[in-house]
């Protein structure tokens, strides 16, 4: 992917949610919400602090993250839909 986010922004590819319930019921596309989990595919250099220093981001490429339903801005790059958001919009990193 040919995009490099600036400053404290990250590029996230949404992870598909499970479309079948535990009971085996298949959920149609029209009934599913957009996933709120994704994988970080690019990160900026860091947040510029008031004193001019750059603080490195806590997330890194490959991290699986959680974010709000309305977080970020959807864009299309190389035919692929991704989200651009600030690191502060990420709620957590999935471990393990």
From Swiss-Prot:
Gene3D superfamilies associated with the record: GroES chaperonin
Record carries keyword Cytoplasm: yes
GO molecular function, one term: protein folding chaperone
SUPFAM superfamilies cross-referenced by the UniProt entry: GroES-like
Entry GO CC: cytoplasm
Keyword Chaperone in record: yes
Record localization: Cytoplasm
PANTHER family: 10 KDA HEAT SHOCK PROTEIN, CO-CHAPERONIN GROES
UniProt record similarity statement: Belongs to the GroES chaperonin family.
Subunit structure: Heptamer of 7 subunits arranged in a ring. Interacts with the chaperonin GroEL.
HAMAP family in the cross-refs: CH10
Protein name: Co-chaperonin GroES
Organism: Thioalkalivibrio sulfidiphilus (strain HL-EbGR7)
Gene that this sequence comes from: groES
């Amino acid at each position: 992917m040919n995009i490099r986010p600036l400053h404290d922004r990250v590029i996230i590819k949404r992870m598909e949610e499970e479309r079948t319930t535990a009971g085996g019921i298949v959920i149609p596309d029209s009934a599913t919400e957009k996933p709120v989990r994704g994988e970080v595919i690019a990160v900026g250099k860091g947040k510029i602090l008031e004193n001019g220093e750059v603080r490195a981001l806590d997330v890194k490429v490959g991290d699986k993250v959680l974010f709000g339903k309305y977080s970020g801005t959807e864009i299309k790059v190389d035919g692929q839909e991704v989200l651009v958001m600030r690191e502060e919009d990420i709620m957590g990193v999935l471990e393990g």
